[in-house]
Every structure is written in C-alpha cells, then in structure tokens.
Amino acid sequence: MKFVDEVSIRVKAGDGGNGCMSFRREKFIENGGPNGGDGGDGGSVYMIADENLNTLVDYRYTRHHEAQRGSNGGSTDCTGKKGEDLFLRVPVGTTVIDASTQEVIGDLVTPGQKLMVAQGGWHGLGNTRFKSSTNRAPRQTTPGKPGEQRDLKMEMKVLADVGLLGLPNAGKSTFIRSVSAAKPKVADYPFTTLVPNLGVVSVDRWKSFVIADIPGLIEGASEGAGLGIRFLKHLARTRVLLHLVDIAPLDESSPADAAEVIVNELTRFSPSLAERERWLVLNKADMVMDDERDERVQEVIDRLEWEGPVYVISAISKQGTDKLSHDLMRYLEDRADRLANDPAYAEELADLDQRIEDEARAQLQALDDARTLRRTGVKSVHDIGDDDGWDDDFEDDEDGPEIIYVRD
C-alpha cells in the first residue's frame, strides 16, 4: 500500500436552495396569498478521524470534493430538502490547514473526532416570508447562499509515545522488532525503512505504549540529502525520543560523529523538538569487546556533552531492552501524573508542543515553497491563481506536496 502523509485538496460545501415564488390557486379562491417555500440548506463538508486508516492515499487521486446542493423551495409552502453533508475519513493524527492563509483549522487526534471544514450555504427565502399587511402578494424571493469553498492541506503525523531517531542502519527497526510485535523490514543496507512503522510495547498485561520508527537521517538531510527531514514531523507528538547510535558500524566510522550528525539535523529541523526529553541508546553492544565498548560509549557522551539517561543495549540479542522498556513505561506514567497534578508543568509542555508544531510546519512549508520555485518559478504556492495551481495530471506530478513510498 502506498504511504501518503501530505495531500492538498479542494472542498466545496453545497449551495443553498433558492426560495420559491408561488401563489395559492384553488377553485373559488382566485386571489390566494403567497405560498412559496424556502430552499434547503446546502450540505457541509466534515472530516472524521478513522482509526482504521493509516494513509492519505485516497485523496491523492481525488482532490475535489463537493457536498450536495440544497433543493429549491416549492409551492404550497414546501421547504426544499437540505443537501447531504459530505464526510471525509482521514487517519487519526491528521492536521487540517487552510492552504491560502496557513491557518490550522483543526487537529484530528481522537478516533471519531469530527471537524467541519466547509459550511453549507444558507437557504433562500420563499415569497411567503415577505407577506405583510401592506404587501399581500409579494413577488420577492432570495437565492440560496453559495457554499464555502476552501483549498486545504492535510498533514498526517503518526501518534506515538516514543520516537526513534538515528542514522540508517543504527538498528532502529531491529529494536522495534525486539520490543514489540511489529515486523518492519530489516536489512544490511541503508534506508531499509522508507515509511514510519508503529509498534506496541507491552510491559505487562495492563501496561503498554506505542513506539514509532522513522526512516534514518544522514548528514545534510535538512538540505534534502537522503530522504530529507520530512519524516521528523512524525516525532512532533511523541513524549520522549530515543536517539539510537550504532557503536559498531560496519564502515568503522566514528559513533560520536554519527551521534553529532543526528543532533545537528534535529536542531536544524526544530530547535524546540531538540528540547524534547531525549534518551541516548547505544546499540550493538554485543559486537565489540567490553573495553572497547566502554571507550566508545564514553566518547559519544563526551562529544555530545550528554547529561541525560544513557542505555547500552543489543537490540538483536535483546540485551538491555527489557530494562529500557520498563524505564520508558515508568517515565510515561510519571509524566502523566505530573501533567495531571502540576499546572505549571502542563503549561510548560503545552508551550513546547505548540512551538514544535509551529517550527515543523514552517520548515515543511519552506521545503514546499522551494520545490515550487524550482518547478514553476513561482515564489510560493499561494501566488498561483485560483485554478492554475490544480494539476490533474497526477502521474507526472512527482514534485507535489505529497510524499509517497511503498509499504512492503
């Protein structure tokens, strides 16, 4: 299945139905009064968070969505039928943005959550509405109001408690396979992981948390190297980050250099995301001798001037993974308790979350504008005319805002 986490669509709410001009005409009632009914309201467009969806691929090929128009009013004071609302189902974790103003319309973060994105047009009035003591036979009606039309950008972020980041082949996918039932592809070449993978880590029968594995970063990712930094947005809503470092790389490169690359790329993407609680996890400890392992671990700690938690593990042999999982669960529980009981801490985290969202969105918008400039010479997608920015030749639109990878 294709994994799409960003799409642009146009939604149009239904227009309101027109009011009717009609007069009562029956036998023996030659001059009956007005009886024209009102039109029906136009249908609105809603988005609903569906926990069974994990991609926005359906909206890549169908970009125009329109709700039903309200019916016109009828004679004998018949009111027109309301247009049917249009419900668009999207994955949980989808942010809906007005493409013209960059205003966030809403976040769909809970299953079943509903968000109106386009208001249906108001119904027109029939001539009955204009009857008065001085105007017994009004010939005045009003047309229905047009439904709201919007160009929207939808961004999906996976919802997870813990996020993994590191260079390609740092062992992120092996780690998530080790601690959960998820089975992401594992191989001995870079960029084995092309899309985010989620796994549920069960610490005991009643306690669990969700962990997210994203494609690896390389030096220069913020300038587009490798798979770029777009996938870092999926870490924006995590509660803690695990920075995995391979201390036994096959190319005999420096683990300290590798760790420093990740910190630099993370900071370039979002300085606030770099402030998120982050634990250092040094992987593949079973592949080096104890003395050499300790030396490499200390080198990484010294290079990063690290003062946070440090774990030395082997994901493939599950050495140290149980302790790490239990410590993560304990941290998440303590964090939840503190959020509930410490308003100042809750406010501090809310401010951090908002800064992360704003910085991530600004970074992604800058990448989109740069790509648009390369393709069209237009400085920003917002400078494109009303219909000029809509290219229905999807197969050739390789540089659009949608990012597509194939999930094996």
Swiss-Prot record:
Residues 127-148, 385-408 are annotated as: Disordered. GO terms for molecular function: GTP binding; GTPase activity; magnesium ion binding. Residues 1-159 form the Obg domain. The keyword Lipid metabolism does not apply. It is found in: Cytoplasm. Monomer. This is GTPase Obg. It comes from Pseudomonas putida (strain ATCC 47054 / DSM 6125 / CFBP 8728 / NCIMB 11950 / KT2440). The lineage of its organism: Bacteria, Pseudomonadati, Pseudomonadota, Gammaproteobacteria, Pseudomonadales.
